Structure formats: structure tokens, C-alpha cells
């Protein structure tokens, strides 16, 4: 009988929770802004973890600058993570910007524009029929 979740999925979920707590409470860097961890992918041997993040950038901050600031803290975050979780080997962490939220908003805006354009065309064609 197979397990509902594989060990790598359970470790990824735990890493996501712990990393969120570490970033929220222990990493103090004004360059980061508000960081959200959207997903964590762990390799099968649990040696590497890809952490996908999004940022709420304020002022002159860009996602690229926030990601660069976060990458400066990778070693320190890994050390804190090692103290919080019990694994034989703490995964090497790599942060990646997750643009799915931005792409989703862009797609939503495109759909809204098309719907509004269609409504406008229907109104215009309805007026032409009346004349």
C-alpha cells in the first residue's frame, strides 16, 4: 500500500513552513520587503531544495533586487533551518523568483480586455442594426 504523500513532499511542506517562519521572524533586511514562499521542490536525495518566492516590493525595490538580497542570506537561512528540522543533511537552498502570480494577473487583464472589447462591438453592431 503506497503512502498518501512521499517523503520528499512531506519534507518540502515542512521546509516551506519553517522557511516562512525564519524569513518572517529572524531575517532582518530592509531590502527584502514582504516575502512569500509559494512552493518548495526537494530533490529525491533531500540534498537540494528549490524555493520559489514572490515579493511585495515597495518603492524602488524590484523583484530582482529582493531576490539578490535574499540570496545573500542563503547560508545563514540554511544554518537556522538545520537547527529547526531533524534531517541527516540540511538541504542546500536555492531561491528562485516565482512569476506565476504576475503572469496570472497579466492573463486575467487580457481576458478582461477581450470581454470588454466584445461587449463594445456588440453595442456598436446593435446600434448599426437600428439605423
Swiss-Prot record:
GO terms (BP aspect): maturation of SSU-rRNA
GO-annotated molecular function: ribosomal small subunit binding
Coiled coil spans: none
Tagged with keyword Cytoplasm: yes
GO cellular component: cytosol
Pfam families tied to this protein: RBFA
Main localization (coarse): cytoplasm
InterPro entries to which the protein is assigned, alphabetical: KH_dom-like_a/b (IPR015946), RbfA (IPR000238), RbfA_dom_sf (IPR023799), Ribosome-bd_factorA_CS (IPR020053)
Annotated keywords: Cytoplasm, Ribosome biogenesis
Location of this chain's protein in the cell: Cytoplasm
Oligomeric form and interacting partners: Monomer. Binds 30S ribosomal subunits, but not 50S ribosomal subunits or 70S ribosomes.
Function as written in the Swiss-Prot or TrEMBL entry: One of several proteins that assist in the late maturation steps of the functional core of the 30S ribosomal subunit. Associates with free 30S ribosomal subunits (but not with 30S subunits that are part of 70S ribosomes or polysomes). Required for efficient processing of 16S rRNA. May interact with the 5'-terminal helix region of 16S rRNA.
NCBIfam families noted in UniProt: rbfA (TIGR00082)
Record protein name field: Ribosome-binding factor A
Gene this chain is encoded by: rbfA
